[in-house]
Amino acid sequence: MDHAEENEIPAETQKYLVERPIFSHPVLQERLHVKDKVTDSIGDKLKQAFTCTPKKVRNIIYMFLPITKWLPAYKFKEYVLGDLVSGISTGVLQLPQGLAFAMLAAVPPVFGLYSSFYPVIMYCFFGTSRHISIGPFAVISLMIGGVAVRLVPDDIVIPGGVNATNGTEARDALRVKVAMSVTLLSGIIQFCLGVCRFGFVAIYLTEPLVRGFTTAAAVHVFTSMLKYLFGVKTKRYSGIFSVVYSTVAVLQNVKNLNVCSLGVGLMVFGLLLGGKEFNERFKEKLPAPIPLEFFAVVMGTGISAGFNLHESYSVDVVGTLPLGLLPPANPDTSLFHLVYVDAIAIAIVGFSVTISMAKTLANKHGYQVDGNQELIALGICNSIGSLFQTFSISCSLSRSLVQEGTGGKTQLAGCLASLMILLVILATGFLFESLPQAVLSAIVIVNLKGMFMQFSDLPFFWRTSKIELTIWLTTFVSSLFLGLDYGLITAVIIALLTVIYRTQSPSYTVLGQLPDTDVYIDIDAYEEVKEIPGIKIFQINAPIYYANSDLYSSALKRKTGVNPAIIMGARRKAMRKYAKEVGNANIANATVVKVDAEVDGENATKPEEEDDEVKFPPIVIKTTFPEELQRFLPQGENIHTVILDFTQVNFMDSVGVKTLAGIVKEYGDVGIYVYLAGCSAQVVNDLTSNRFFENPALKELLFHSIHDAVLGSQVREAMAEQETTVLPPQEDMEPNATPTTPEA
């Protein structure tokens, strides 16, 4: 036996013994002394807010310009090699993705290069993540393309009698203007949200929602790329059912497919799939992943130029890539009223994708990212970038994994990648003018593999949470058929409705005691758990507020089987039977107390003559009900206390407090005490502010724990038994007397 086993304490001897008073709320408060809270005056707060100290200035600079904090602490010898390798690896991937995602955005390819340069440089200064790769992203590019195609469709008539070539250029110029306007507006939205500290909005985009949305976006991207892969000419669609129209259009024109274009695309597709599998299998042995996309671009460009595929076989190619950077231009703000819905969706989706990947990599490497500053950084990248003809950017998942996986330590790796793009823009762009669009299509489709793998979420959510499965499926279906903008809005609404549903339909549990312990567990779950005679313990795992207060009251009566209306009805029957037996017509016609209560959500007040079948187990209440009438009551368990477990209730509103007050009175009218156990400070404050404790004696109903409430109930009943034994019976007790409401 090893040392650990020799010193191991048998489980049956691991016990704890506690001896203390029964803590009702007043008793516990007598033992506690509230700390004096020293609050600053308004003048002191204003003075502190407007006082300028070197430390405060430094912290503001660090917050708004994170580069001023991490760059001076840059460990050159440790970081430079990793950043160098990572920057080159990310740059060679960013080039083909920039060209390909420009096709998704419905703008000329060179604008994808601009979007891969300017925002990356700006994010290096303002971003808080050290590892994510900022630039064009398939989902955001597709959303931009949807707006551009909606406002500037393929069949738009350009005034001026231009020829086909010039007409295409004019159409593309209009689409660039639309993309710039959407980008500027989405950037302004992100910046304003960040300044107003609205970074928390990302929490409303739950993981099932984001994954369902990106999966639907992957289907949209896939269908958009098919026409380039097959080399067919089809109209580009946007809006509701656009994915269906795009697929049908490709299938209708498949007889006109370009075999050469398809062959080149499939060759690159196979090369990338096999190469990525090789990279994944040998990633531990490779110093860096093989830049397959870059090799595909070089190979595709070489084959296209060598065999003159564009002229000889009508293969569509990238076309002219003008050298040099364009001068700044003002986006057309007059389009804002046409694109604001899309801009909001793009701003939120772009931020959500960025912050989720940033947090994932930050947790892996042990540092913090600031959601509000990320919003500001993205807002600056998009709003200022739009002046230089960029379209909306976000975090690219595939590039971020490459940048982190190849040893990147800081955003200097991203800067190096953007400098490689700058080299292409200024000097070598013309080399890629012969690149077939089918190659870019294959690159995009292969990079969708990770998103399509998210279909494996379905069996996981089926096993773990049907509600999250519903969110995933509804998000996917709505985004697939309604379009990404309205699909996202629909998905957020559905996600919020599930939050309401969870609180409106919580789980209700009747608890029992594990014998000889202070442990109380679901009585239906374990055989060892037993109910305490005379006591019902009822638990809810949600707040009690206007949406579920009536359901809570009904569930309490249904699950515990203790319904005041049924109890009162049983007493009426007992009095009628007693009156019939003794022939006392005065008793039979005596006035009884009418009780308004709910049975299964309906008004349970009934006339005396009604004799409906009792739906709940017969229960006799231990009260001052006349002893000579007890034999007429149905046999059942004597219930004297109902304990409401509030340990999982985090707040109550005024409607919930009124419902609780009604429950206390309703049960009190039939002689049953209602105790509240485990109330948090917030719940006590809610009860106090809603005047639940107008009668101070009601505070005696509050107990620190379930066990305190159980012991308090048992002590109260024991004392009542002693009083009954000592005191003579009351001779003048009226048969139809109603027991008074129990007092704490």
Curated annotation (Swiss-Prot):
Changing R197Q: Shifts the voltage-sensitivity to more negative values. Residues 242-253 dip into the membrane without crossing it. Residues 1-75, 127-137, 197-206, 277-291, 360-370, 407-410, 465, 505-744 are cytoplasmic. The record marks R399 as: Contributes to anion binding. It holds the Pfam family STAS. Residues 505-718 are annotated as: Extended region for STAS domain. Residues 105-108, 150-168, 231-241, 254-258, 308-332, 389-396, 432-436, 482-484 are extracellular. Changing S465C: Is only accessible to the intracellular side application of thiol-reactive reagents. Is not affected by thiol-reactive reagents extracellular side application. It is a multi-pass membrane protein. Changing K235Q: Shifts the voltage-sensitivity to more negative values. Gene3D superfamilies: STAS domain. The chain crosses the membrane at residues 76-104, 109-126, 138-149, 169-196, 207-230, 259-276, 292-307, 333-359, 371-388, 397-406, 411-431, 437-464, 466-481, 485-504. Induction: Up-regulated in cochlea by thyroid hormone T3, perhaps acting via thyroid hormone receptor (at protein level). It catalyses: 2 hydrogencarbonate(in) + chloride(out) = 2 hydrogencarbonate(out) + chloride(in). Its main location: membrane. A motif (Involved in motor function) lies at residues 158-168. Disulfide bonds: none annotated. Residues 525-713 form the STAS domain. The record marks S398 as: Controls the electromotile activity. Changing R399K: Does not affect anion-dependent electromotility-related charge movement. GO terms for biological process: bicarbonate transport; chloride transmembrane transport; chloride transport; cochlea development; fructose transmembrane transport; monoatomic anion transmembrane transport; monoatomic ion transmembrane transport; negative regulation of monoatomic ion transmembrane transport. Belongs to the SLC26A/SulP transporter (TC 2.A.53) family. PANTHER family: SULFATE TRANSPORTER. The anion-binding site that controls electromotility and associated charge movement in mammalian corresponds to the central binding site of the anion translocation pathway in non-mammalian. This is Prestin. It comes from Rattus norvegicus. The lineage of its organism: Eukaryota, Metazoa, Chordata, Craniata, Vertebrata. The gene is Slc26a5.
